[in-house]
UniProtKB/Swiss-Prot annotation:
PROSITE patterns: RIBOSOMAL_S10 (PS00361). GO terms for biological process: translation. Part of the 30S ribosomal subunit. InterPro entries: Ribosomal_uS10 (IPR001848), Ribosomal_uS10_CS (IPR018268), Ribosomal_uS10_dom (IPR027486), Ribosomal_uS10_dom_sf (IPR036838). PANTHER family: 30S RIBOSOMAL PROTEIN S10 FAMILY MEMBER. GO terms for molecular function: structural constituent of ribosome; tRNA binding. It comes from the Bacteria. Involved in the binding of tRNA to the ribosomes. This is Small ribosomal subunit protein uS10. The lineage of its organism: Bacteria, Bacillati, Bacillota, Clostridia, Eubacteriales. It comes from Acetivibrio thermocellus (strain ATCC 27405 / DSM 1237 / JCM 9322 / NBRC 103400 / NCIMB 10682 / NRRL B-4536 / VPI 7372). Keywords: Ribonucleoprotein, Ribosomal protein. GO terms for cellular component: ribonucleoprotein complex; ribosome. Belongs to the universal ribosomal protein uS10 family.
């Protein structure tokens, strides 16, 4: 069987616009260096809801809810070249995006 290499990149961010811009940068960089790209695939958004009391002592019926959404994208780079890996390492992405890379 042939040696199949792929790089799997998972992106996470609270702001979906910044996340999509980062994903487009990665896809464009990989395609420019000659690798095949699959994605970006939108993964389910995590939604965390936090409920707190509005008043410091009593009034238990008065509560406030806050939510935090974590948007995720998945990009697979198939048949990466050394040039692709080098270009991805030098890529400058925004600070609000978390990146996980698996080889």
């Amino acid at each position: 069987m042939a040696n199949k290499q792929k790089i799997r990149i998972r992106l996470k961010a609270f702001d979906h616009q910044v996340l999509d811009q980062s994903a487009e940068k990665i896809v464009e960089t990989a395609k420019r260096t000659g690798a095949k790209v699959s994605g970006p695939v939108p993964l389910p958004t995590e939604r965390e809801v936090i409920t707190i009391l509005r008043a410091p002592h009593k009034y238990k019926d008065s509560r406030e809810q806050f939510e935090m959404r974590t948007h995720k994208r998945l990009i697979d780079i198939l048949l990466p070249t050394p040039k692709t890996v080098d270009a991805l390492m030098r890529l400058d992405l925004p600070a609000g995006v978390d990146i996980e890379i698996k080889l």
